[in-house]
């Protein structure tokens, strides 16, 4: 079994989801959201995200990590802050020795619901289909689980291609 953490980075809320995969099977382990205090300065908020994610990685001991890529919007300040939160989301698992993969939002949706553009409710429904025991509160945790599933599908495809080349 390979344990994967998916991370949906955000300065206010960073979602995380842990799954295990073996072949085509997926198993829900845990999910949640790390929040930062909007009344604190940026550095302190980033520390809150770092410490919260480090605790999750330490507690659940994933083998690999996947983080959603950011999109650039018209608000440059918001994009920069999201980029800083994303840096934390990549740094924490990397410092724990995990390989960190990155996926575009449309690749995540395609892996979970079959198309690159879809509604949050479609993702929630498919998470329950793929992992009936999955529990998630809010979009951030659901998105993080979807990111982990996307990585599980992609790592399986890569492993299959490597096996075909070797054999």
Curated annotation (Swiss-Prot):
Residues reported in the UniProt entry to bind Mg(2+) 1: 8, 140
Quaternary structure and partners: Homodimer which binds Holliday junction (HJ) DNA. The HJ becomes 2-fold symmetrical on binding to RuvC with unstacked arms; it has a different conformation from HJ DNA in complex with RuvA. In the full resolvosome a probable DNA-RuvA(4)-RuvB(12)-RuvC(2) complex forms which resolves the HJ.
UniProt family annotation: Belongs to the RuvC family.
UniProt cofactor(s): Mg(2+)
GO molecular function, one term: crossover junction DNA endonuclease activity
List of residues binding Mg(2+) 2: 68
Residue numbers annotated as active site: 8, 68, 140
Keywords in alphabetical order: Cytoplasm, DNA damage, DNA recombination, DNA repair, DNA-binding, Endonuclease, Hydrolase, Magnesium, Metal-binding, Nuclease
Role noted for this protein: The RuvA-RuvB-RuvC complex processes Holliday junction (HJ) DNA during genetic recombination and DNA repair. Endonuclease that resolves HJ intermediates. Cleaves cruciform DNA by making single-stranded nicks across the HJ at symmetrical positions within the homologous arms, yielding a 5'-phosphate and a 3'-hydroxyl group; requires a central core of homology in the junction. The consensus cleavage sequence is 5'-(A/T)TT(C/G)-3'. Cleavage occurs on the 3'-side of the TT dinucleotide at the point of strand exchange.
Top-level EC class: hydrolase
Signal sequence coordinates: none
Identification of the protein by name: Crossover junction endodeoxyribonuclease RuvC
Subcellular location: Cytoplasm
Organism whose genome encodes this protein: Sinorhizobium medicae (strain WSM419) (Ensifer medicae)
Co-factor binding details: Binds 2 Mg(2+) ion per subunit.
Highest taxon, organism lineage: Bacteria
